[in-house]
Amino acid sequence: MDALSLVNSTVAKFNEVTQLQASPAILSTALTAIAGIIVLLVITSKRRSSLKLPPGKLGLPFIGETLEFVKALRSDTLRQFVEEREGKFGRVFKTSLLGKPTVILCGPAGNRLVLSNEEKLLHVSWSAQIARILGLNSVAVKRGDDHRVLRVALAGFLGSAGLQLYIGKMSALIRNHINEKWKGKDEVNVLSLVRDLVMDNSAILFFNIYDKERKQQLHEILKIILASHFGIPLNIPGFLYRKALKGSLKRKKILSALLEKRKDELRSRLASSNQDLLSVLLSFRDERGKPLSDEAVLDNCFAMLDASYDTTTSQMTLILKMLSSNPECFEKVVQEQLEIASNKKEGEEITMKDIKAMKYTWQVLQESLRMLSPVFGTLRKTMNDINHDGYTIPKGWQVVWTTYSTHQKDIYFKQPDKFMPSRFEEEDGHLDAYTFVPFGGGRRTCPGWEYAKVEILLFLHHFVKAFSGYTPTDPHERICGYPVPLVPVKGFPIKLIARS
């Protein structure tokens, strides 16, 4: 509603009030309030009209282009969604997503603006409903110094030094999983099995949960919670969000009992401070000697469980799908991994030294992340008006950076639609800054990226040791990105060829 329409509406309402013979005091108060609103709207309207907003379209009221965005998620056409608008409006364009005016920034400059200006120009933006599901004390939601402290705490488990302690255990878990659930099978569904694998790893490495029934409980709860992220956030019967809230409460009940038990075990020295993620977070002290609250420990255990489950399972599945279409790349992975295996003694597990030797396999993983990154990008909210590329992005608007605007552009990656791991064979630094951003960047770089890297490389190592090859039952299986990160719609069923 513009200022003139509001004035006309206000006059009509005022006439109704005066006809009801309201008291002079009430009329005076009402007129003052209405006048103030009108003045404020006129000023805001004039200010907004004086700004050079990015080109684009906001779509239908409230809905905006959310339906088109979700449709693109479902059909794996997010790249086209971005490129069509970029081609029409330029590297900076406006739209409306989830009921809010949004600016999408394309190219390295846009990525740099968002990823290098956390808490300077922009801050993380979650709806209250989603924040409640993620955990109000989680590293994904917290800002400023609270966020910094949580990252330091998580690094004790997820960083390189922490991973040194757990890599052997993770390697054994993955080897045993493949021996038990893959070997001896003619055909398997990759997505289904890697979900089981990642869930098992997380339950054991994060919480020391070995009980199958308890792991299955967490698994079922997690599937409901992740499915709710793009649902309508209404807490009423029949909606996924309500089921997710109930699931969160059930999950909290399960893990709260574990937390109390672990605190007792740590006090009595029946558990070590680095036994798993739960122990690491309970034992953490910041620079002032202050521990994390129980709520922060639980919320961040939840957050790591959620993050490791969906993005890692997506990439494990997609990397096998891409290698199936590029057999020469698969053979190079096989050669590298079998050479590493040949240098191990019977029963000796993979070490961080071995991970560093997986240079080509790491290139394959990076190329898979470039071509099919599980994450489209992330949202931020502007803290003040921002001037960028000749346009003003108003305070309070959403801003989105996206992997699609650089990962699949010929100007940054030659032949972007071709699977070429060799493009990453040079040492770090050969890529232009902010062109390859699968894990985000800046203060909010994915805290678990090294953990995910190690888990995926270990999976590939044990997979090629067990199988000399595989063939997809549907080589042209479609990719879908809704409601979870990109995955093949059928889960990528494959026929296995056992290594003799």
UniProtKB/Swiss-Prot annotation:
<dbReference type="GO" id="GO:0036239">
    <property type="term" value="F:taxoid 7beta-hydroxylase activity"/>
</dbReference>
<keyword id="KW-0479">Metal-binding</keyword>
<dbReference type="InterPro" id="IPR017972">
    <property type="entry name" value="Cyt_P450_CS"/>
</dbReference>
<keyword id="KW-0492">Microsome</keyword>
<keyword id="KW-0503">Monooxygenase</keyword>
<keyword id="KW-0408">Iron</keyword>
<comment type="similarity">
    <text>Belongs to the cytochrome P450 family.</text>
</comment>
<keyword id="KW-0349">Heme</keyword>
<dbReference type="Pfam" id="PF00067">
    <property type="entry name" value="p450"/>
</dbReference>
<dbReference type="GO" id="GO:0043231">
    <property type="term" value="C:intracellular membrane-bounded organelle"/>
</dbReference>
<keyword id="KW-1133">Transmembrane helix</keyword>
<dbReference type="InterPro" id="IPR036396">
    <property type="entry name" value="Cyt_P450_sf"/>
</dbReference>
<keyword id="KW-0256">Endoplasmic reticulum</keyword>
<comment type="pathway">
    <text>Alkaloid biosynthesis; taxol biosynthesis.</text>
</comment>
<dbReference type="InterPro" id="IPR002401">
    <property type="entry name" value="Cyt_P450_E_grp-I"/>
</dbReference>
<dbReference type="GO" id="GO:0005506">
    <property type="term" value="F:iron ion binding"/>
</dbReference>
<comment type="function">
    <text>Catalyzes the conversion of taxusin to 7-beta-hydroxytaxusin in taxol biosynthesis. Catalyzes the conversion of 2-alpha-hydroxytaxusin to 2-alpha-7-beta-hydroxytaxusin in taxol biosynthesis.</text>
</comment>
<dbReference type="GO" id="GO:0042617">
    <property type="term" value="P:paclitaxel biosynthetic process"/>
</dbReference>
<feature type="binding site" description="axial binding residue">
    <location>
        <position position="446"/>
    </location>
    <ligand>
        <name>heme</name>
    </ligand>
</feature>
<dbReference type="GO" id="GO:0020037">
    <property type="term" value="F:heme binding"/>
</dbReference>
<keyword id="KW-0560">Oxidoreductase</keyword>
<keyword id="KW-0812">Transmembrane</keyword>
<keyword id="KW-0876">Taxol biosynthesis</keyword>
<protein>
    <recommendedName>
        <fullName>Taxoid 7-beta-hydroxylase</fullName>
        <ecNumber>1.14.14.182</ecNumber>
    </recommendedName>
</protein>
<keyword id="KW-0472">Membrane</keyword>
<dbReference type="GO" id="GO:0005783">
    <property type="term" value="C:endoplasmic reticulum"/>
</dbReference>
<dbReference type="GO" id="GO:0016125">
    <property type="term" value="P:sterol metabolic process"/>
</dbReference>
<feature type="transmembrane region" description="Helical">
    <location>
        <begin position="24"/>
        <end position="44"/>
    </location>
</feature>
<dbReference type="GO" id="GO:0016020">
    <property type="term" value="C:membrane"/>
</dbReference>
<dbReference type="InterPro" id="IPR001128">
    <property type="entry name" value="Cyt_P450"/>
</dbReference>
<dbReference type="GO" id="GO:0102365">
    <property type="term" value="F:taxoid 2alpha-hydroxylase activity"/>
</dbReference>
